[in-house]
Amino acid sequence: MRILGIDPGLRVTGFGVIDVSGHRLAYVASGVIKTPTADLPTRLGTIYDGVSTLIREHTPDQAAIEKVFVNVNPQSTLLLGQARGAAICGLVSGGLPVAEYTALQLKQAVVGYGRATKEQMQEMVARLLSLSGLPGTDAADALGMAICHAHGGNTLNTLGGIAPALAKKGLRVRRGRLVG
């Protein structure tokens, strides 16, 4: 099964594509969709078009996207919600079922600690997918979203979560830190 993860943002939207087979996670692609400095409709159109292109290029079976959190600044929350909406429209237009997860669910599923830092997310994603370097923060969150969906969507053993994949690599999580 191929999963497309999306980390929505008005300036930068992260994406990550993984293949899941049993307990095995395999990296396919990741990166960002950058919007131009332009009016809001143009930026939202760029996100929609970018997501649509990703679906055509990578042919995912399912998608996962981060739920909007309420920011201190209501204007920022509204803009993020619009960017997320543009991404969801692209996913649905591409015929994908879309799952939504909170940042807490994402961090808990990937790192094993709901208050994990960006750096901890990057490190764990790189280890779980056997990457040679750390992905950028937006791409790491998007890859993490795909991993979270693989876990929550019963593609990985939900009783063991990501523990079997970590154990095979000689790793475990202790106090939010990856140890080996």
Curated annotation (Swiss-Prot):
Stretches that traverse the bilayer: none
EC code(s) of this entry: 3.1.21.10
Annotated binding of Mg(2+) 2, by residue: 66
Cofactor dependency: Mg(2+)
Cytoplasm as UniProt keyword: yes
SUPFAM superfamilies named among the record's database cross-references: Ribonuclease H-like
Source domain of life: Bacteria
Binding, Mg(2+) 1: 7, 138
Substrates-to-products reaction catalysed: Endonucleolytic cleavage at a junction such as a reciprocal single-stranded crossover between two homologous DNA duplexes (Holliday junction)
Its job: The RuvA-RuvB-RuvC complex processes Holliday junction (HJ) DNA during genetic recombination and DNA repair. Endonuclease that resolves HJ intermediates. Cleaves cruciform DNA by making single-stranded nicks across the HJ at symmetrical positions within the homologous arms, yielding a 5'-phosphate and a 3'-hydroxyl group; requires a central core of homology in the junction. The consensus cleavage sequence is 5'-(A/T)TT(C/G)-3'. Cleavage occurs on the 3'-side of the TT dinucleotide at the point of strand exchange.
HAMAP family per record: RuvC
Family membership noted in the UniProt record: Belongs to the RuvC family.
Oligomer and partners: Homodimer which binds Holliday junction (HJ) DNA. The HJ becomes 2-fold symmetrical on binding to RuvC with unstacked arms; it has a different conformation from HJ DNA in complex with RuvA. In the full resolvosome a probable DNA-RuvA(4)-RuvB(12)-RuvC(2) complex forms which resolves the HJ.
NCBIfam families reported in the protein's UniProt record: ruvC
The protein, known as: Crossover junction endodeoxyribonuclease RuvC
Originating species: Burkholderia thailandensis (strain ATCC 700388 / DSM 13276 / CCUG 48851 / CIP 106301 / E264)
Lineage: Bacteria, Pseudomonadati, Pseudomonadota, Betaproteobacteria, Burkholderiales
Gene: ruvC
